[in-house]
């Protein structure tokens, strides 16, 4: 599974400083703890909306995973930061996600 995460320019999020590669925490709950990311890149904009200041990365969630029922947000106990995305890459990933949702929804209706 791959997901997306927004960060402050120094790779921090809510006071925690992430590092490239694997990051580990003991608990994962979408409402209160764990490392958060989103399956839909565009959901990152709800939390890190200033694209001129924030950075966005392709990540791989692992360990215990808790999913949110409001959007595609995920909390996990392991988060591997794979790489930073350029703005163009971010929107290409978002478009691919939308196309994947559309084609899977369309296939379900057949």
Question: Where would I find each of the regions flagged by the language model?
Answer:
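ADP-ribose/NAD+-binding catalytic cleft of ART/PARP-like enzymes
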Residues: 1-33, 52-55
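Generic structural motif
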Residues: 7-9, 61-64, 84
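Generic surface-pattern signal
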Residues: 9, 49-50, 96-100
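ADP-ribosyltransferase catalytic core
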Residues: 25-79
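Negatively charged, Asp/Glu-rich surface segments that serve as flexible interaction/assembly modules
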Residues: 67-101
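Conserved small/polar residues in nucleotide/adenosyl-binding loops
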Residues: 102-107
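Extended, polar beta-sheet/loop recognition surfaces of beta-rich domains
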Residues: 110
């Amino acid at each position: 599974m791959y997901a997306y995460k927004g960060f402050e320019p120094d790779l921090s999020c809510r006071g925690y400083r992430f590092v490239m590669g694997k990051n580990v925490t003991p608990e994962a709950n979408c409402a209160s703890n764990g490392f958060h990311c989103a399956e839909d890149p565009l959901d990152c904009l709800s939390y890190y909306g200033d694209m001129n200041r924030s950075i966005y990365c392709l990540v791989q969630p692992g360990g215990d995973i808790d999913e949110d029922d409001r959007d595609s947000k995920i909390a996990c106990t392991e988060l591997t930061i794979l790489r930073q995305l350029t703005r163009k890459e971010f929107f290409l990933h978002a478009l691919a996600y939308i196309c994947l949702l559309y084609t899977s929804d369309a296939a379900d209706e057949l």
